Swiss-Prot record:
Tagged with keyword Nucleus: yes
Function, in words: Transcriptional coactivator that specifically associates with either POU2F1/OCT1 or POU2F2/OCT2. It boosts the POU2F1/OCT1 mediated promoter activity and to a lesser extent, that of POU2F2/OCT2. It recognizes the POU domains of POU2F1/OCT1 and POU2F2/OCT2. It is essential for the response of B-cells to antigens and required for the formation of germinal centers. Regulates IL6 expression in B cells as POU2F2/OCT2 coactivator.
GO biological process: cellular response to virus; germinal center B cell differentiation; positive regulation of interleukin-6 production; positive regulation of transcription by RNA polymerase II
Keywords assigned: Activator, Nucleus, Transcription, Transcription regulation, Ubl conjugation
GO (cellular component) term, any one: RNA polymerase II transcription regulator complex
The protein's name: POU domain class 2-associating factor 1
Gene Ontology MF annotations: DNA binding; POU domain binding; transcription coactivator activity
Record note on domains: In the N-terminus possesses a conserved domain OCA for bivalent binding to class II POU domain-containing transcription factors and to an octamer DNA motif.
PTM comment, free text: Ubiquitinated; mediated by SIAH1 or SIAH2 and leading to its subsequent proteasomal degradation.
Region of interest called Disordered, as start-end residue ranges on this chain: 1-23
Protein species of origin: Bos taurus
Family the entry assigns: Belongs to the POU2AF family.
Length: 256
């Protein structure tokens, strides 16, 4: 007889579990505690190096044996503050030589010795209330009258003079020449004008009476009178003509 092993019923799939995070072998708190312990122990063993922003000091080499490593006997040190026997005596400083006095520079020339063209005597010559000439005597012109005379108030008898023209910058100095004869003594004009011819005696135009006929306007015919004069037959014919025209117009539009 064949014995059949009873088969186990098929296991149903387990329901999915919610996400509970990643399981760590060692908890995080323990790791942090260990890290802090290592940091504290390392700080006690190895001091932390402090970096200063100052420039590094120059290194000096010791000459001869150091004073601290030597065994100094009592006979060596005579007084407090005496020098150590191992130190090397410094050489005596060389005698300072006085500096020679400064030699004068041969090419230097005092500014007082140079004759500046602008160091000459300067003179001021007022030309007008708002203009003054400053310069040496060779530039100024000595005249009895000012160069510009158009600065006073104008009078009725004085001739009209235009404004002074602006000349170039480098203009020769002007010289004033006084007018020997005043304007009032000038001779008057000798040109004589002929008087106009007298008017012709008597009237030149003769007035003639002219009669202008008035235009006669044609009498406008009264439309009422024209309509009254027409007979009834003519009126009927005119109405028929107007009706036929309207009818023909409508027919042509409909046929189109």
């Amino acid at each position: 007889m064949l014995w059949q092993k009873p088969t186990a019923p098929e296991q149903a799939p387990a329901p999915p579990r919610p996400y509970q995070g990643v399981r760590v072998k060692e908890p995080v708190k323990e790791l942090l505690r260990r890290k802090r312990g290592h940091a504290s122990s390392g700080a006690s063993v190895t001091p932390t190096a402090v970096v200063l922003p100052h420039q590094p000091l120059a290194t000096y080499t010791t000459v001869g044996p150091s004073c601290l490593d030597m065994e100094v006997s009592a006979s060596t040190v005579t007084e407090e503050g005496a020098l150590c026997a191992g130190w090397l005596s410094q050489p005596a400083p060389a005698a300072l030589q006085p500096l020679a006095p400064w030699t004068p520079y041969t090419e230097y020339v005092s500014h007082e010795a140079v004759s500046c063209p602008y160091s000459a005597d300067m003179y001021v010559q007022p030309v007008c209330p708002s203009y003054t000439v400053v310069g040496p005597s060779s530039v100024l012109t000595y005249a009895s009258q000012p160069l510009i005379t158009n600065v006073t108030t104008r009078s009725a008898a004085a001739p009209t003079v235009g404004p002074p023209l602006e000349g170039p910058e480098h203009q020769a100095p002007l010289t004033y020449f006084p007018w020997p004869q005043p304007l009032s003594t000038l001779p008057t004009s000798t040109l004589q004008y002929q008087p106009p011819a007298p008017a012709l005696p008597g009237p030149q135009f003769v007035q003639l009476p002219i009669s202008i006929p008035e235009p006669v306007l044609p009498d406008a015919e009264d439309p009422r009178r024209a309509i009254g004069s027409l007979t009834i037959d003519k009126l009927l014919l005119e109405e028929e003509d107007s009706d036929t025209y309207a009818l023909n117009h409508t027919l042509s539009v409909e046929g189109f």
